[in-house]
UniProtKB/Swiss-Prot annotation:
NCBIfam families: PRK05406.1-3 (NF003814), PRK05406.1-4 (NF003815), PRK05406.1-5 (NF003816)
Entry coiled-coil feature ranges: none
Name of the molecule in the record: 5-oxoprolinase subunit A
Superkingdom of origin organism: Bacteria
Family statement drawn from the similarity comment of this UniProt entry: Belongs to the LamB/PxpA family.
Species, as recorded: Burkholderia thailandensis (strain ATCC 700388 / DSM 13276 / CCUG 48851 / CIP 106301 / E264)
Length: 254
């Protein structure tokens, strides 16, 4: 049994370098919701040094709301925005001796792409047209994952250690009760169940089947680093191999 651990980096949380010792894939903010060129370069350099797979973390252009505000934009604008952000991170990665291996949308763009076919197609088209060898990280069992596979891209299904789920497999919105799981024991138990049992219990009590291929560890909580360490240890103690999906890694060139 195997699993990937990923974290969203370059968002100003201050623990990026330490998290890169624990995760196997890094989703690096591309400046539109957080971060910027210096942070992108730092994260890429650290990822290359530590052998962590590099991913782009594009979003809506919304630094005021950390990219978490839903937007109604033309598909052409979403396409162009994703393409722009991929190009920026790719240039930095190339200069640092690495390359992008995957793409994971951020925040509202991630959630809207999971349920809106037009947005999913716009994001997938941008990724495919930029580099069809890139893998796509998306919410497990979502329409975004289906769209990526339909376009011939490798899709990696993502689950969340610290987020509540609804019965349809979607995440509980952050504005609603049950959105965040902050009890460490519960997070560890849920993560092991998602990876080994391929299911998660919804906030309404039902078991929801899912295909867990990568687990997101958010790096912006007060205990995020300690929890990331414990979850890595728990997975390895359970005999689960932790590594990035596929053969693409940070230090490889195309």
């Amino acid at each position: 049994m195997e699993i990937d651990l990923n974290a969203d980096l370059g968002e100003g949380c201050g623990s990026d370098e330490a998290l890169l010792d624990l995760v196997t894939s890094a989703n690096i903010a591309c400046g539109w919701h957080a971060g910027g060129a210096p942070a992108m370069r730092d994260c890429v350099r650290w990822a290359v040094e530590k052998g962590v797979s590099i991913g782009a973390h594009p979003s809506f252009h919304d630094p005021e709301n950390f990219g978490r505000k839903e937007m109604d934009l033309p598909a052409s604008e979403i396409y162009a925005g994703v393409l722009y952000q991929l190009g920026a991170l790719s240039a930095i990665a190339q200069a640092e001796g690495g390359r992008i291996a995957h793409v994971k949308p951020h925040g509202a763009l991630y959630n809207q792409a999971a349920r809106d076919a037009e947005i999913a197609d716009a994001v997938v088209s941008a990724i495919h047209d930029f580099d069809p060898s890139l893998a796509v990280f998306g919410l497990a069992s979502s329409g975004f994952v289906d769209a990526a596979r339909h376009a011939g891209l490798v899709a990696v299904e993502e689950v969340f250690a610290d987020r509540g789920y609804r019965a349809d497999g979607s995440l509980v919105p952050r504005s609603q009760p049950g959105a965040l799981v902050d009890d460490e024991r519960e997070m560890l138990a849920r993560t092991l169940e998602m990876v080994r049992g391929q299911r998660v219990r919804a906030v309404t009590g039902e078991w929801v089947p899912l295909n867990a291929q990568t687990v997101c560890l958010h790096g912006d909580g007060p205990h995020a680093l300690a929890f990331a360490k414990r979850i890595r240890e728990a997975l390895e103690a359970a005999g689960i191999d932790v590594h990035a999906p596929g053969a693409l890694h940070a230090g490889e060139r195309a």
